[in-house]
Amino acid sequence: MTNSNLRTENHFDYVKIKLASPERVMEWGQRTLPNGQVVGEVTKPETINYRTLKPEMDGLFCEKIFGPSKDWECHCGKYKRVRHRGIVCERCGVEVTESRVRRHRMGFIKLAAPVSHVWYLKGIPSYVAILLDMPLRDVEQIVYFNCYVVLDIGDSKDLKYKQLLTEDEWLEIEDEIYAEDSTIENEPIVGIGAEALKQLLEDLNLKEVAEQLREDIATSKGQKRAKLIKRLRVIDNFIATSASPEWMVLDAIPVIPPDLRPMVQLDGGRFATSDLNDLYRRVINRNNRLARLQEILAPEIIVRNEKRMLQEAVDALIDNGRRGRTVVGANNRPLKSLSDIIEGKQGRFRQNLLGKRVDYSGRSVIVVGPKLKMHQCGLPKEMAIELFQPFVIHRLIRQNIVNNIKAAKKLIQKADDEVMQVLQEVIEGHPILLNRAPTLHRLGIQAFEPKLVAGRAIQLHPLVCPAFNADFDGDQMAVHVPLAIEAQTEARMLMLASNNILSPATGDPIVTPSQDMVLGSYYLTAIQPQAKQPKFGDYSDTYASLEDVLQALEDKRIDLHDWVWVRFSGEIEDDDELQKPLKSETLKDGTRIEEWTYRRDRLDEDGSLISRYILTTVGRVVMNHTIIDAVAATS
């Protein structure tokens, strides 16, 4: 983080996500008050007092830990108003500050026994299992108190390090160790639960294991080699991030700020609360009960059962339903855990951070715009007037059409011709960005020149559809207006659709006709079997130029699939080039007429072409005329 800027906001170079140590977790939530008291640990499961409706001290909404629930007011009411800013009340210990600190101040729960982090234990792949080089099933047996694991073999010759033992097997070994005739001096050490897992992870020397793995990889092959590489990769990542494997076992749990898991009073006096509060409450209750059982030296079986329950409560808090039975609330609805809040389409990242609403943007259904140029898109007038409103207001005032913003807005609401004229001037040369989710590659966002259209749908050129993976069956697209002149320049130079013809991934053309265009081209050039071919000289079906055919089509004197004779002087390709004409006739003036299947040529005495009529369909005339025009425009 750079410290060069002395303003209130901090400028970050990057955000790094890595494992947090137990000390770091406690550091997040711990604060030392001016009187020397350290606060931050949440020890009580209570939320608010049902009589006073104020947060309970040391509870999940504690004002001493998280800050006051009312601006500039302590819990007991001794200090009120902003003039007491920064004072810590000597009676209740609450700092007099703004209530918004409750959105970022954290707390923590110090656990009476370590618990495994369910993401690293039950994730795919399981990092704990990979690091320990043990099957996931065996690691689970240890964590959930089904099996003991050997941590130190001592003098025993029958045991192996990391060997799993059932309750009965361990009892037998214990009997041998403590028998009168036993020769074992160094007793083997076994463990169970997350404490044993933590011990196994602490025993790992990552650098030595990595060195050994590199030697083994050099001499192994196949499935075994792939497994070793997988383990080495995980170990190298731990070394690179300076994280210790035992941090995957939690000694303290962070408690997120109370305003991010609120409790709201409803009209009937009842309360609606975030599911996280219920999950935190389960953890605190079980943690306190475990601490009490350890204090009174309760039997091992009871303590172990409570530790397992604590492990399950923490699992449910972090990722409810990942392992074991899903914790449900009222009306059998699964409670939303921290993972549920973060992950998925409706999660914090995709919904609230990446997908947040922005100014100067809109969204609408897309329809095909066949008359558009490739770099253009049809923008509905209603949408354009809203997106470009500040620009329109500025221009209306500058042109002295109105005197102030209020008058300009009234004029815009009427949407008369004057406003539309100004809007047309504003959007001229101002590119807009179109984006279709999901944006899987850079061509998912492209720039276009807007053209005002009637209706409420955005019109899109059919050739750019493959880049967006869009079709016209109800897809929606978002519109964004680049504001800065640099952004507009970048959009025009780099992002314009006509500049993005090749795929950045493969280099192949991405602007290819597909779907409607292929079908349309086929329909346009298709021949109807039952259509009658006219004889040459039939006045009603003979035309002097391609333009005459198009004019006749526009006047609805002919249809797309009608056969016509049309005079054409350009190059043609024909299937019967190598064959002889069907009929050849020399006229009195020395010119020769040649009749072929689909054309009729008139040649002079030297064999040079005087005129040519071709037999074709109206649709093919439309197709060829369009292509000839396009080629002429680019050359």
UniProtKB/Swiss-Prot annotation:
Binding site for Zn(2+): 74, 76, 89, 92
A Pfam entry, by short name: RNA_pol_Rpb1_2
CC terms in the record's Gene Ontology section: DNA-directed RNA polymerase complex
Cofactor requirements of the protein: Mg(2+); Zn(2+)
InterPro entries given in the database record: DNA-dir_RpoC1_gamma (IPR012755), DNA-dir_RpoC_beta_prime (IPR045867), RNA_pol_asu (IPR000722), RNA_pol_N (IPR006592), RNA_pol_Rpb1_1 (IPR007080), RNA_pol_Rpb1_3 (IPR007066), RNA_pol_Rpb1_3_sf (IPR042102), RNA_pol_Rpb1_clamp_domain (IPR044893)
Recorded GO MF terms: DNA binding; DNA-directed RNA polymerase activity; magnesium ion binding; zinc ion binding
Record keywords: DNA-directed RNA polymerase, Magnesium, Metal-binding, Nucleotidyltransferase, Transcription, Transferase, Zinc
EC number: 2.7.7.6
GO terms under biological process: DNA-templated transcription
Superkingdom assignment: Bacteria
Group of enzyme by EC: transferase
Catalyses which reaction(s): RNA(n) + a ribonucleoside 5'-triphosphate = RNA(n+1) + diphosphate
Ligand binding (Mg(2+)): 471, 473, 475
Function: DNA-dependent RNA polymerase catalyzes the transcription of DNA into RNA using the four ribonucleoside triphosphates as substrates.
Family: Belongs to the RNA polymerase beta' chain family. RpoC1 subfamily.
HAMAP family hit by this protein: RNApol_bact_RpoC1
Protein name according to UniProt: DNA-directed RNA polymerase subunit gamma
Lineage: Bacteria, Bacillati, Cyanobacteriota, Cyanophyceae, Synechococcales
Gene expressing this chain: rpoC1
